[in-house]
Each structure stands twice: as C-alpha cells, then as structure tokens.
Amino acid sequence: MLSALGLGALVYTIIEAPARGWTALPTVLGFCAAAVLVVLFARREIHASQPMLDLALFRDRRFTAASVAVAVSFFALYGFIFLITQYFQFLRNYGPLETGLRILPVATCVAIGSVAGTVLVVRLGNKLVVTAGLLSLAVAYAWIATASGATSYREIVGQMVFLGLGMGLTSAPATESIMGAVQADKAGVGSAVNDATREVGGTLGVAVIGSVFASFYTARFHDLPRLPGGLTQQATESVGAAFTIAGQLPAAPAGALRAAASTGFYDGLHAGCLVASGVALVGAAVAAVALPARPAEKG
C-alpha cells in the first residue's frame, strides 16, 4: 500500500506540475509526500520478518545497477512511444494504423538487439553491452531532439534503429544480471523486481517526458490572443485538441492556433528528448561503474 501510494503521489505530482508550476506549493508538497511514503515503505520492509521486497538485495551493486538499467530502458521506450505517436498522427497526419506500421522498426530492432545482446554478453561481458545499449538510447534521443517538420521518415527510421537496438542490448543482459545476482531461493523476488522496474520505469517515462513536453508546449499559448468559450485552455491540453479547435475557427485565428500548437509541440519534443537522453546517460554511467565486467560464478 505504501509503495503504491508513494509512486502514485510521485506520478500525479509530476503530471500536474506543468499546470500548477514546478515550484508551486502543491507541487513541492506532492514531492515531499511521495518521498515520505517511499521512506516509510523502506523502513517497513527493513523491519518486516517477511518483507514484500528484500531491500538487502540492493546492497549488491550488480543487482542495483541492472535494475537501474532496466528502469531506464523502459523509461526511454515508453517516453518515445508517447511522443512519436502524437508526432505521426498530428504533425504528419497519419491514422492510427499508419502510425503503428511506421513504429514497427522499433519493435524489430528491439528483437534483434535482444538476441545480439545475449550473444555479445558471452564475449564482451554485461558491463560493456549494457553500457553500450544505454549510450545508444542516449544517442537516439539526442538525434530525435533535432526532429522538425522537414525530417524525412528515413531519418526517423535511423533514430528508431538506435533506440530499438539500445533497448534490446540493455534489457536482456540487464535482466540476466538481476536474476544472476540472486540465490535460487530468491528467484521469485528477483523476477518481481525485474517486472517492477519495467513498470516503474515505463510509468515514470510517460510522466516525466510528458510533463516536460507539456510545460514547453503550453508556453507557446501564453502570447496567443484569447479564444472565446475557453477554447485556448482546451487547446493547451494536446496538439490534437488544438488542431481540432483550429478547424472550427476563421482563417486568421486558426492559422495562429495551428502555428502555436506546432511550434509548441516541437519545443516540447526537443526538451523531452533531451531530458530522456540525459537520463540514459546517467544510466550508462551507473552501468559502467557498478556492473561487473564478468559476473562471478556462483558456487
């Protein structure tokens, strides 16, 4: 319960921060509440006779670094899906099916990267492979941050190749490291932590990247002439809503609204991608420092 409340408070605060302000009192209190709940959860687990999560496992640098790597990889993947679907549907005017087909290179490269990762780990070790995967994610996001209306689909495919391969190279070897770091009688706990890091990483990816995106997107509407009936506020909710509203307006205000929404979208896309790239770089640094080159054999 405490863990769910803590994560829920954190995600809710991050999502609401663009509207309330990152330094507003409700936002600060939300982050404080999330921190308190997480600390209470940790203390409860430490003193429990049969803890739901054995925090002692995180004393193992291999286990901790691999968990961070898995979380970061899913942070990147879910954040990318959040951004790219809007880009294809609203900025490129593709339908849902067309959008899904154009994202297929990511899934294909994740599969290829996962297979390649398990092979490369045998020759190169977990540290090098996982670090390379996270660096590939960082490169992918830094490249995506340069996207504009003139970006060709071929270039986007290149970005997706880096992202998919990075995801595959990271997640499969990191998962092996998590499971390899626990004793046989703790395998269930290791599997649960692996699943939890994926879910938490993905959830935070959408929340953090989405909130950064929203902060920059809405900023473009501040200088826009007010529209009747609260339409300006509705337009700030999403680029799709802005384009729908623009279709109901006369030519002049419609053009201004579309321009603000398009520019705001790219502002948010660039900022969100740079944040994600930074997170991937931090994950790569953790993997490079904490993951062993070759895991010790268990006796």
Sequence positions of predicted segments:
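Transmembrane core module of solute transporters
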Residues: M1-S3, L7-I15, R20-D185, V189, ...
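Polar low-complexity intrinsically disordered regions
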Residues: V121, G125, G272, E297-G299
